């Protein structure tokens, strides 16, 4: 079966970029064989192509940087010239390319602006023992009461305030105890996890929150005045803020699933309650980078912004990068004059303020806030997972590469407002929890969408089996139910079957004629703008039909889906524009942004999502088979009967194999070292292994047939087990559930057996559930100790610090989440002694800085568990992982219980860790061993990468000497080919970063080149293999290719073409084998009047060609099994970056790569570069 998906668009359809490239996709061409399409994914309605989506996101972001930089430059110029900044006109203006220098300057202004907000002061200190002051804000002396007019005359020289000067020891600005705190913080592995420090000015003892983070030149210390003199009150206030956040998080977690809108509405209410701002909104970033207000809580007299859409430029990519690095951003007063940062002249560039809590807003943003009547703001990033593994190191404010910025929670206030750092930190935890909850909701929504698509596909397939192909438009459900659209149509055997909003029959025939002429070599097309796709009749269709997806079934049969323009879907809940607001279109204001957004999307539809295109492609494949069967006269009923016969034969053959597997499984279960037992659908025992018999004292013969609930467990476990059985018999399998088993015979005197079980649904060969199997772990020893420990009323230290191996790792928290106990088992497990952790905050200092956690969300989850336990809500078997002092990764289950006084008042929490079994630890050790081998291979590659440069320099030098000699024409051609190969290899070695290829940021070095030279270089690289395998090379290359010139990255094109050709050489059959190179260049006329060169290459060989696993690797984005597949996958991505595409097609007698590369002509490329 063919598999494929659409190509990635070069630009978002509605990102306020005035002349955005068209959002258009092509499917692969299949001619009776197996076709694979560049871009990953595939049929079946599932969503693949995560890497393609990531590359698409990166390409959009890179493109938007240029527009952001241009708007920034226009704003700066308008301020310098005294003219007003017309926001809407600036968006509509035709884009002028921004140079790399302009973009770099723009990013520097945003990230290294050199000013801070005046509600605090900033220091930059050398990260060494000198604590030398590298930079400070001009208000530092005043805030720290170090100015001469603040000091009191004294004869004591030590009372004279130290000067705030570059090069001075920063510790002298603070009280001695505060200096000690700073020294400890500087020595920490992850300094930001200790924030905030409570420090005092040396002279006035005024308290400050010190928020620290490391940068390229040292450590930045942001100082914000604190509101109380007592550090204990400060800690209690911070804990109280965290408790409020945890309470809000608990409410979020209690919401019914499947309602993202309700989740967002609840978040804005809680954030407004927590922070007191006048307006709180949830901004969501769409796939095309534009934003939308999806939830809002506001003061009654404020204008609503719910439903507002705004262009991508309203929140520039540089700002989005800052939100990824610093998740919480506060502006206390947009009218306040910024304070300059004075820095050491020896620093090579302005101080990096990306992570600073005090960084001053840019003038453009401050003006935007003022125009909308917002004086103060608090903005929090909403980060969700985009697939991939967690990062191994946690750093507050930083996020793993597998996370994405979903949106923002934005708070506005109509007067100056400054909330203390502990409350902002608590909000950050709330946002992390919101992100986790949102991620689950989005995954659920995606799964429901996939189920809907699969159900619709199933019904459509059923129609095709029972009826003619026209049933998919004449019956219900129809093809309109497959994806979201305003209309759909089938063009079959010259007849037109429209549904909903569609073009007329005359118009659809015109569209088909255009598709045949301009896109006849593909199997489909999708676009959000027919006008931008180049369709001449787009204007006649009007707003009713803007976007279209089409799938070719046969050369004369087509499926269509249509969408109307985006503006139809969008309504703003805000106030209407009043005629007297004359400057509304020019001022930077939400209404202006909404107007600009509608202007951009007026001729566009909503974009076609990857999952929708996969669903369309799957139906396309099904219909192809159906139409082919119909053409061949195959009876559907006969096909079904034949299929059933074949299925029956397969089942009979499989029964013997299943029996063999079943016997082996029974043997493994019987000899397992963990308790395993099973029940039938009535809950009666039908499996009881030797280990559970040993633990309970009940033999296999005695256990068989007994009721698990009525005969074998204690009454307190009955409800749990009944629920467990009921869910497992429905197919819902639960894990880590504790049950209490009875003991019999000699074992009865030892008391009950506690086991943690995983319930697995048992199925027969027809996949019907026939029972439940329980795989358990005996935790009786730990449970008994834990229960005694929790219930003890007197001195518990004898138990805590008992070296008995039955005592589990235990630590305790006081009411302020500070560590109050750390037993011997915890010391042994973590490598950290009791003295090193007691008194420190468990959240951040102990677990975070001492014991590093795996990913930032792990810290949030631990904080929630701890606060819930302190508040009286126990937690059992919470998965908890961390790195010990030596970097060893520890995986455990955490049980947290409330710690109470005799009168029942909660004073903290007891926490117990249950460590993974030795078998599981051995599996982790094997995994680490594989990681170590991968690291060794990386070192080998780094060595090769370094050493290969010297021979390359020698080849380059030799070629340069030969160029200075008198050579014949054929010798000069050989030299040109050798030089081209050398430069290709140099390019690969120089740009060896696969990450830049993966994320779409690879820089292409474009220039004019000769196609003849490229083909000579490509062929020369496969000649040795051709001769060794005695293969014939067939060249079907027109003479004009030798003289043709094009504009692009010559050596990357050589690399890609050579890899694809070499693959055909390697897998061509040796006997009577051949490899064919075919090129058919032509000129493509674009809608803007320019011409481009279209180069379709075909590399073919007889037979099946590449093995399936290599083809699969080529279109994979993350997992590879073959070395050749990795190389082809990288080349496919490079080709995609150059605007090309590749298909692998397998026909009955031959296989071939079909590569299409579209390149500008050198003259037009040069004219564009100078315009």
From Swiss-Prot:
- Which residues are recorded as binding phytochromobilin? 364
**Any Pfam family hit:** HisKA
**Histidine kinase domain boundaries:** 943-1161
Compositionally biased tracts (Low complexity)? 1-19
Task: Provide any one GO MF term from the record.
Answer: phosphorelay sensor kinase activity
Biological processes, Gene Ontology terms: detection of visible light; red, far-red light phototransduction; regulation of DNA-templated transcription
What does the UniProt keyword field contain? Answer: Chromophore, Photoreceptor protein, Receptor, Repeat, Sensory transduction, Transcription, Transcription regulation
Q: What does this protein do?
A: Regulatory photoreceptor which exists in two forms that are reversibly interconvertible by light: the Pr form that absorbs maximally in the red region of the spectrum and the Pfr form that absorbs maximally in the far-red region. Photoconversion of Pr to Pfr induces an array of morphogenic responses, whereas reconversion of Pfr to Pr cancels the induction of those responses. Pfr controls the expression of a number of nuclear genes including those encoding the small subunit of ribulose-bisphosphate carboxylase, chlorophyll A/B binding protein, protochlorophyllide reductase, rRNA, etc.
Under the subunit heading, UniProt states: Homodimer.
Name of the featured protein: Phytochrome B
This protein's species is Oryza sativa subsp. indica (Rice)
